[in-house]
Amino acid sequence: MSNASLVTAFILTGLPHAPGLDALLFGIFLVVYVLTVLGNLLILLVIRVDSHLHTPMYYFLTNLSFIDMWFSTVTVPKMLMTLVSPSGRAISFHSCVAQLYFFHFLGSTECFLYTVMSYDRYLAISYPLRYTSMMSGSRCALLATGTWLSGSLHSAVQTILTFHLPYCGPNQIQHYFCDAPPILKLACADTSANVMVIFVDIGIVASGCFVLIVLSYVSIVCSILRIRTSDGRRRAFQTCASHCIVVLCFFVPCVVIYLRPGSMDAMDGVVAIFYTVLTPLLNPVVYTLRNKEVKKAVLKLRDKVAHPQRK
């Protein structure tokens, strides 16, 4: 970072809303955040204790639940603070750096993980007899590690390009968390090259992952159409539709915010709610809690807790 950086703290403008809605929004987002954390913790616990769920699909789901729990934690608590009092809008320079890094780290890792999960479902549906050998434990670990390392590299690029510039004047960020586009608008230097590199970097990651996901689901649909029973096709299509809704809730807002021409405006904070608040809450429901195997495991865990002496 530049030694010319004089700004020691930033002020977050928060989520755009009418002044009288502070208490209502605080209550809503607090409940959503608590449900998100508890839902993802439950998924992690259930998959951990039930050996029947120790499969590649649930291995990736544990990674997703872990990411979602912390992805929401990176932004939502600070957003709640901005709704409580004006002093809650302040964030130190170094805290802002950390928030931006972990936001992009977890967000891009989730992006890569969606791609891996769609590939896993493609193999499971298209090659059911060879699936176990094709998705061995070592291969699952390698794919998961690759998503985390790729996310870390992507985030490092975003953070370095954003904060190596000098910040010596305005310090009001038009957002409810620290993100690259609104922060770059405050830099005391030409940001055109930085904006272009960030645009290309995010564009390659987002569009590349989305194209691979679409190709995987097109192949899955082709495989589903070859299923002879109408009930089997219906259930498979319902599962794919649910997964696609979550993917769209994550990718479409990202495209709107990061890959559109023009500068960021205040309403982008509202759009960002979809992937910072809504998607982490939906994932436990769509990917696991609607699954019969997980429901059965949850009931078994409940019985163990309620009747610990039963065998």
Curated annotation (Swiss-Prot):
Domain of life: Eukaryota
GO biological process: detection of chemical stimulus involved in sensory perception of smell
Bilayer topology annotation: Multi-pass membrane protein
Extracellular side stretches: 1-23, 74-98, 160-196, 258-268
Glycosylation sites: N3
GO terms, molecular function: G protein-coupled receptor activity; olfactory receptor activity
Family annotation (SUPFAM superfamilies): Family A G protein-coupled receptor-like
InterPro entries: GPCR_Rhodpsn, GPCR_Rhodpsn_7TM, Olfact_rcpt
Positions of disulphide bridges: C96-C188
Transmembrane residue ranges: 24-44, 53-73, 99-119, 139-159, 197-216, 237-257, 269-289
Nucleotide-binding keyword on record: no
Main location: membrane
Keyword Ribosomal protein part of the UniProt annotation: no
Subcellular localization, as worded in the UniProt entry: Cell membrane
UniProtKB keywords: Cell membrane, Disulfide bond, G-protein coupled receptor, Glycoprotein, Membrane, Olfaction, Receptor, Sensory transduction, Transducer, Transmembrane, Transmembrane helix
PANTHER family: OLFACTORY RECEPTOR
Family stated for the protein in its record: Belongs to the G-protein coupled receptor 1 family.
Its biological purpose: Odorant receptor.
Protein name as catalogued: Olfactory receptor 10G4
Organism of provenance: Homo sapiens (Human)
Gene name, Swiss-Prot/TrEMBL: OR10G4
